[in-house]
């Protein structure tokens, strides 16, 4: 299972909760390992390419580690798709940097396993910003509404034509998956009762009524 969406929407929270509920393995991004990320938040134009390339190589290594494990090991819940790397690059990099990024990208093999289900969490930028402020990551406070809007738009375009795996689209604006158990249980009910639904955009809160 892969969970996707823009910064602050609740990907990692949901991945950890699903992993705990079903005794799955959480397969998470490791942004704290990126030595360029702090400077990127403060001054994106100076550190964008280095930040993006580090994430690209990091995700490549994570995918390789995943593929080397036994197919009979436990189910994994990831808080990212490998395709997000190019998505972030298109939002973050200048035209010149994007040319260099593409040259690196085309020489890397990213044969990631196809998820059995992708959950795309959506929320407007005001909600994203409020959640980013609430979780208190000092460096993330530099993220602007303009950046979040461009990122949100990029995600919407990406998933508009996404057909690689079953896709469940969730409006995460009015739900609290971290502390409201009824919201979380409604989402789990939706997933379990519709395991192969494509391009569905219900509200877990509505489902629980």
Where do the model's predicted regions map?
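Conserved small/polar residues in nucleotide/adenosyl-binding loops
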Residues: 199-204
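Glycine-rich phosphate-binding loop used to anchor ATP phosphates in small-molecule kinases
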Residues: 51-112
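Hydrophobic anchor at the beta1->P-loop junction of P-loop NTPases
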Residues: 3
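P-loop (Walker A) phosphate-binding loop of NTP-binding proteins
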Residues: 6
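Conserved substrate/cofactor phosphate-moiety recognition/catalytic segment
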Residues: 20-57
């Amino acid at each position: 299972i892969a969970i996707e969406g823009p910064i602050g929407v609740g990907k990692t929270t949901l991945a950890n909760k699903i992993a705990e509920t079903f005794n799955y393995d959480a397969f998470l991004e490791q942004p704290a390992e990126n030595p360029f990320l702090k400077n990127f938040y403060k001054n994106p134009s100076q550190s964008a390419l280095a930040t993006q390339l580090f994430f690209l190589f990091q995700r490549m290594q994570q995918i390789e580690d995943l593929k080397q494990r036994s197919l009979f090991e436990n189910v994994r819940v990831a808080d990212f798709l490998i395709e997000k790397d190019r998505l972030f690059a298109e939002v973050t990099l200048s035209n010149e940097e994007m040319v260099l990024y593409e040259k690196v990208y085309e020489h890397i093999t990213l044969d990631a396993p196809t998820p059995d289900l992708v959950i795309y969490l959506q929320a407007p930028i005001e909600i994203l910003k409020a959640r980013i402020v609430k979780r208190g990551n000092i460096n993330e406070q530099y993220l602007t509404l303009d950046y979040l809007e461009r990122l949100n738009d990029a995600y919407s375009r990406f998933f508009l034509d996404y057909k690689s795996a079953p896709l469940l689209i969730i409006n995460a604006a009015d739900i609290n998956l971290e502390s409201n158990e009824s919201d979380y249980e409604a989402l789990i009910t939706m997933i379990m009762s519709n395991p192969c639904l494509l391009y569905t955009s219900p509200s877990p809160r509505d489902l629980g009524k």
